Structures are given as structure tokens and as C-alpha cells.
């Protein structure tokens, strides 16, 4: 309808009335809620144990698995160290897995061997001491999934005598120090522990204002809140990919603490280390 300049028309003169707009808004909101709910279901962290451990959890009084030690390796070099220096002993069995989905982790599969999986969190249990669990995590755990990961993993374990050890790597460029990083003996280890962790550590403690993030930080914070003794070993390196030099930088950890009694024979270590590095080189060459 024609009108003169400056006249204010009623909103009901528009082609779509308010009731139709409200219906459209309600439909959009309902669709948004369904999308959000579907994403939440898709991003849920799921912990699966093998049938034997599932039965043990169900039969225990607190519905939790007896556990004295959890060793968590995060990233290629940390999992490479665990594969070569600990799992190569052969006295381990697949115990379970953590599966999740996010923008950087879309296909998590449980591995049947001891090589680092390309995208998974796999649990192994010591055959000689069934209370010792080891977890290799090569997949990215998104920020909104970190709390879920900690709650569901540690919610399955008896915590009364539990100790936690976490291993990971970080670019040396992120290490904060008054001196130049060029003068540092890269790679090198730093440790960060909870207030309940009383054992000596075989490397210097991480100095302020350095911080840790991701899954190691979430696990350490979770243990601090629950009063679980935990220590995190961070290897600072100038090599981003998996390599034997960075893997070997973790060797001082085998001289003390809970890892000392888990070391494999030297022959098995060297053979597995060679295979691990060679396999990574072959996979890297596929993209050249």
C-alpha cells in the first residue's frame, strides 16, 4: 500500500504475520536442539573394557576395577617409548579402549598389536601384575571431552592405592626460560606432580610460568582434586614427528618409580624401536 514519506506502518501490514514468524522460530529452535543433542551424543566419550574386566568390575563391591598404577602415554613419541621399552616385553594384554569422535579424531579402533594406533586410546593390562594398566593415546581429545575422559576412565578404577604416571611431548619453542632455547640440551625432560605424589623424580621439576594443557593437564588436575598421587613427565623436543632421539629421552624414567620394574629386555627394546620408527617413516613417505 502506498504511503507518504515518514509514516509508520503497523507490523501486521507485512507479508508474514507474527504467528507465522513464531511458528518458524519454534521450528528452527526445535531443529537446533535436535542438532545439538545429536552432536552431544556423537561427541560422547565411551570406555569399553574386555569381557574379563567387565565381569570383574560388575562383581566388585564398588563396581570398580582394582588398580595400583595407571601409565598414560599421549602422542607419538610417548607411545613410541612405551611400545618399545615396556610393551615389547610381551607380558601385556589388551584390556579395553576409549572411543571418541571430534573434528580431528573420526575413526578410533582398538589395536590388537603393540604399535601405536593412528587414532585411538587403547588400554593394556600387565599379565604379571593385573593391577597395572597402561594407556596409549594417539587421538586428539577435544577440550569439551577432557572432563568426560577423566570421569569415565577413573570412575571405573579403585582409587584407594592408585598412582598415575603421564608421559607426553611438547615443542621446545613453548618452553619459557630466561635463556635462549638454542642453548638447551634438546630433548630434555621436566616433571610436574600433584601434592600427594611423594616419590623422587629423575628429572628437574617444571618451572613457572610454564604450563601444560590438553589431556595431561586434565588428568593431573583430576588427580589433584581427588587426592590421587600423580606425576607428569613432559619431554621438550625440537622434532615434531616420531623419532628415536625423542623416544630415548624418556629412558631416565626407567631408573626409578613405577616404571622401573616394567622395562622390557634390551633385545626386545631395540627391535621394537627400530620397527616403530621404520613404520612411521614408511607412512610419512606416502604423503611425499
From Swiss-Prot:
Family from the record: Belongs to the PSMG1 family.
GO biological process: chaperone-mediated protein complex assembly; proteasome core complex assembly
Species: Xenopus laevis (African clawed frog)
Subunit organization: Forms a heterodimer with psmg2.
Name of protein: Proteasome assembly chaperone 1
UniProt entry keywords in alphabetical sequence: Chaperone, Cytoplasm, Endoplasmic reticulum
Function in brief: Chaperone protein which promotes assembly of the 20S proteasome as part of a heterodimer with psmg2.
GO cellular component: cytoplasm; endoplasmic reticulum
Gene: psmg1
PANTHER family cross-referenced by the UniProt entry: PROTEASOME ASSEMBLY CHAPERONE 1 (PTHR15069:SF1)
One Gene Ontology MF term: proteasome binding
Post-translational note: Degraded by the proteasome upon completion of 20S proteasome maturation.
Chaperone keyword on record: yes
Disulfide bonds: none
Compositional bias ranges of the Acidic residues kind: 17-33
UniProt subcellular location: Cytoplasm; Endoplasmic reticulum
Tagged with keyword Chaperone: yes
Ranges for region Disordered: 1-33
InterPro entries: Proteasome_assmbl_chp_1
